[in-house]
Amino acid sequence: MATSFSLKSESGSLNLPVLKLRCPSCAAELGNMDEILTEAKACRSCGNRITLTDGIARALSPEGRKRYTRFLDEYSKIRHAEGRGSENPGYYMALPYRDLSGKHAEQWAIRGESYRYFQERILPQFEKDKSPLDILDLGAGNGWMSYRLALRKHRPVAIDILTDPLDGLGAARHYHALLDERFPLVEAEFDRMPFSDSQFDLAIFNSSLHYSTNYHRTLKEARRCLRPGGRIVILDSPVYKKREHGERMLAERHREFQARYGFRSDSIPSAEFLHEAALEELADFLGVRWKIYKPWYGWKWFLRPWKARLSGRRPPSRFWILVSETTDEHR
């Protein structure tokens, strides 16, 4: 069983699980996370270092940092213009169930219902087999899900490339202030995670898989980090029946961003959506089946496809919860 210890950083005491790290640049094994961050050891193969700054383990490779510079600049401009985040600590405590800012209440209503469904109907199935669980929170944002999981005594690790103090990993300080054992914050990309193989029980894509530029590569990397029998969970990524429906959505959004912000927000060729044929192909690639859960988001959400059909608009996305199951579980 993993344990934790107290590591001093600029932001105070940070409790880290005993995890093995590998270099995000060359994949060479580095050793224990606590030793690597305490001593800022360089990779013996390529010289890359994973350091701890403001309580965040900086594990984005140099080439990754360069690749995402423009994306992060544009993404941050959009998010700040939309009024994401808050200076009020209470805002973060209310997530995902309430948006105290009132600026994105409908979006958080969906996020809240997705997580409520996951927490009440899906997570207990995993907890019967093992608890606490070691969990990758992929696309953790401000860390709200890791906080909720930590309250259930699990061991989450929050992963994101956005470290913004209002909207990214930097905002997790509000959650850390209330926890005796703080969950680790790791700046890293999905396709090059700094963890050795087989250390986690769940890999949860937290409204984030659609940011992947290559689903095969991203899901293969998540599976690498999982123990035998570990599960991939996909929350709040848009799913369309047909590919062309998602492509129409993407074209609409690019036009909207160009008009509103002066750029299309496509510097990174993210996939942006899933569709049913792609899910089938990804299941074959991974050697799994997707168990599909469909939370109830209310009548307004339920009637969206009918309204779209009557008005001649493209079919809207669906937000399913997808959980990977090995094919052996169906025999």
Tell what function each PLM region has:
Residues 2-86:
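N-terminal auxiliary segments of SAM/dcSAM-dependent transferases
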Residues 136, 142-192:
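Class I SAM-dependent methyltransferase SAM/SAH-binding core
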Residues 54, 58-129, 148, 233-257:
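Conserved class I S-adenosyl-L-methionine
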Residues 191-203:
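A short acidic, Gly/Pro-enriched loop at the edge of an enzyme's catalytic core
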Residues 216-231:
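A short glycine-rich, Lys/Arg-flanked "PGG" loop and its adjoining helix->strand segment in the class I
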Residues 327-331:
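Short, low-complexity, charge-dense intrinsically disordered segments
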Residues 202-214:
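A short SAM/SAH-binding and catalytic strip from SAM-dependent methyltransferases
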